[in-house]
Amino acid sequence: VQTCALPIFYHRSYWSPRVTGFLRRFDHCNIALLIAGTYTPLAIALLEDPRALLIIIWSCAAGLIAFRLLWMGAPRWLYTPLYIVMGCIAVAYLPVFWPVSSAATVALSVGGIAYIAGAVVYALKRPAIAPLHFGFHEVFHSCTVIGFVCHWSAIVVAMSA
């Protein structure tokens, strides 16, 4: 809930610079938590022994959280690919996921593509469809909603497989 509610809370109000800085840090750290939190039920449901993947992904999450807490001013071109790399670790596991649940694997893949498209939009700051009302940031969040729905669907399907 927090990973979805915080961006709305953060973006829908005007805050003091101090509060904005805190919310921005929290928002960026939540991305790593969302990625690792998505991997966790999928790994448990689809892998015979999920320990290696869970250690890798939660270590990545801890590292990314520390990185964003310590260097919030890092350039967009540096930190955005780190989230993409963390998300793409799943590619190595797709052949193992497929025989257990092809539907979950497809939903996971489509969601990953949506998230990557959103990350590219965020990194490039374009396209801005209607700059005053629906800019690149709204396109980015639209992609993340699509990715979230696909990944939630993958988790539901995998947990019932």
Where do the language-model regions lie?
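Multi-pass alpha-helical transmembrane bundles in non-GPCR membrane proteins
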Residues: 3-161
